[in-house]
A protein has these predicted regions:
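Transmembrane catalytic cores of multi-pass membrane glycosyltransferases
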Residues: 32-43, 54-56, 63, 71-72, ...
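Transmembrane-helix signature of polytopic, membrane-embedded enzymes
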Residues: 107-129
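Short hydrophobic/aromatic helix or loop-helix immediately within or flanking a transmembrane segment
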Residues: 45-52, 63-88
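Short periplasmic/luminal acceptor-recognition loop of GT-C membrane glycosyltransferases, typified by
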Residues: 367, 377-459, 468-481
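Signature aromatic-anchored transmembrane alpha helix within multi-pass, membrane-resident enzymes
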Residues: 329, 333-358
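Transmembrane-helix motifs of polytopic, lipid-linked glycan transferases
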Residues: 94-114
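Hydrophobic/aromatic-rich transmembrane helices and adjacent perimembrane loops
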Residues: 310-338
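Short acidic/glycine- and proline-prone juxtamembrane loop motifs at membrane-interface regions
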Residues: 136-143
């Protein structure tokens, strides 16, 4: 078999090999009923609200939807389109499975176009798709980044084929598509396009006006999303920008690039990726000048971007694994090493992808089993109830934490119940809680508590329970609270419990007839 240049196709460049890599990329997500990513239950709760609340009077009386051109709608839009066929939970699972599939396809296409053929080292980049941001449940961002990689790979292809109308249209319209998936996905796409423009037009250290003009004109193709951004980010929707130059955190996010469950395994995996890039930078491996420039642009952006960027938290954490992936794609074995050495490297890359995929599959299966145990309480929650959930995360927080802080949202999806677990992000979410729920208990920010003796910033469980507006809720759901720390108030009637979770009915005090009559005399 030969490639487009008439050269022999090696086994790591075959369709069968690429197909195997794509299967390995989706394998961890196949078993769990819903993807066990930290924020996903809250996202699914929002999807359930957005797809129609006609049959859920409690939800329709509390939530409102404010449609606006938010740069945070990728998975939302796809689930909205698919839910009539399969329901919200299966639609969410299907869309999230597509994220690593599209990401891997995009990364492999970038590597193939940059090197002229798929290098033996390319597969080393794929495990970075299952990165900390993905495990955290930043699914709209992850979809935006996947689209950015795929469209950038197509841009490189049509630039090689000398089809300027096609690649310019891809940048122009692709920018808008990626923006609506997630605004930071558009930023990632911009970094890729800017780095590529520098490679194409900056040909020497002596910068000319023609070079600057060519780079600027190519980058202006990215500007179409500025129209909805101006509409969206006007008024009170600008968001916070803070924590510049947290240098120690920068290295921490690189070490945490694949953070999930096993600190040594994931830390060493990240260091392997750094080491591979280092081999290219010092010249031991061949490095694509095009992708090296893209990597340097992303690295510069990573160093300067703050933790919070116009309301987007963990901004630098999201960029770290994507930057590493591009750095790995830039490297390749030197031709002088021969086919045997390249084949050995390809086998090592395949082994790395397989090991990472198997480990993530095991991790996700364990999270899914754990979630099933936490959610045994759901049948005891009356349909349409108003539930205040209080979650006590582990203390102290470690590398691996149980993904429980957003599990209360499963009561929205499976019991049509209100739960205080939607995100409070003005201008970044379409769903808002109405005035019937006091704001101090309306959103996810009200749900986390700490137990006595725990040195965390959340309020004490007992203090938070005392503040519950009893008239606004029917039930209290405690997660992560052991029996010794559970309340014994007379207005809380136990309904269900196990060693980790408890549900109480809130007993409202009846006004006595004497009190209704008022004072005498």
């Amino acid at each position: 078999m030969t490639n487009r240049r008439g050269k022999r196709v090696n086994w790591w460049q075959s369709k069968a090999y690429v197909g195997l890599l794509l299967v390995l990329m989706i394998m961890p997500l196949l078993w769990p009923p819903f993807p066990p990513l930290d924020d996903v239950p809250t996202h699914m709760g929002r999807f359930y609200i957005q797809t129609g609340m006609a049959g859920a009077p409690t939800l329709s009386s509390i939530f409102s939807i404010d449609w606006m051109p938010v740069g945070n709608l990728g998975v939302d839009a796809l689930v909205y389109a698919l839910h009539p066929l399969m329901g919200v939970e299966p639609a969410t699972k299907l869309v999230i499975i597509l994220i690593p599939l599209l990401s891997a396809a995009g990364l492999l296409l970038i590597a193939r176009e940059a090197h002229g053929e798929l290098p033996a080292t390319a597969a080393f980049a794929l495990p970075l798709i299952y990165n900390y941001a993905f495990h955290y449940g930043f699914i709209n961002f992850s979809l935006g980044a996947a689209l950015a990689f795929l469209l950038f790979g197509l841009v490189l292809r049509y630039q090689r084929l000398k089809m300027p109308t096609v690649w310019r249209t891809l940048i122009l319209l692709g920018s808008l598509l990626i923006y609506f998936a997630h605004i930071f996905g558009w930023v990632v796409f911009g970094l890729l396009v800017v780095g590529n423009a520098l490679y194409r037009h900056v040909t020497s250290w002596k910068i000319s006006l023609a070079m600057v003009r060519a780079v600027v004109l190519e980058c202006l193709l990215l500007a179409l999303p500025l129209i909805p951004i101006v509409a969206w980010r006007s008024g009170d929707n600008q968001g916070e920008t803070s924590a510049f130059f947290a240098i120690f955190d920068k290295w921490g996010w690189i070490e945490s690039a694949m953070r999930d469950r096993w600190v040594k395994w994931e830390g060493l995996s990240a260091l392997l990726c750094v080491g591979l890039i280092g081999l290219g930078i010092v010249g031991l491996m061949r490095m694509s000048r095009r992708l090296l420039l893209v990597f340097l642009v992303m690295a510069a952006f990573y160093i300067f971007i703050p933790y919070a960027f116009f309301g987007l938290i963990y901004a630098d954490m999201r960029i770290a694994p994507l930057m590493l992936a591009i750095g790995i794609l830039a490297i390749a074995p030197r031709p002088a090493w021969g086919r045997t050495a390249a084949s050995a490297i390809a086998l090592l890359a395949l082994a790395f992808v397989t090991a990472r995929s198997v480990a993530t599959t095991i991790s996700y299966a364990r999270y899914a089993d754990d979630h099933a145990r936490w959610l045994k309480v759901l049948p005891s929650i009356p349909r349409g109830a108003r539930v205040v959930a209080l979650v006590a995360p582990p203390c102290p927080r470690g590398w691996n934490v149980p993904r429980i802080i957003h599990l209360p949202s499963m009561a929205i999806i499976r019991r049509d119940a209100f739960v205080n677990d939607q995100f409070d992000m003005p201008g970044a979410q379409l769903v808002a809680v109405g005035p019937s729920i006091p704001r101090d208990f309306a959103y996810h920010s009200s749900a986390q508590v700490r137990l006595p003796g725990c040195d965390r910033p959340e309020p004490l469980l007992a203090d938070r329970i005392a503040q519950i507006p009893r008239g606004a809720f029917d039930h209290l759901w405690l997660l992560g609270v052991d029996p010794a720390n559970r309340p014994k108030a007379d207005w809380l009637r136990p309904v269900w419990s196990d060693e980790r979770s408890a549900l109480y009915a809130i007993v409202r005090q009846k006004t006595s007839s004497a009190a209704k009559a008022g004072p005498r005399g």
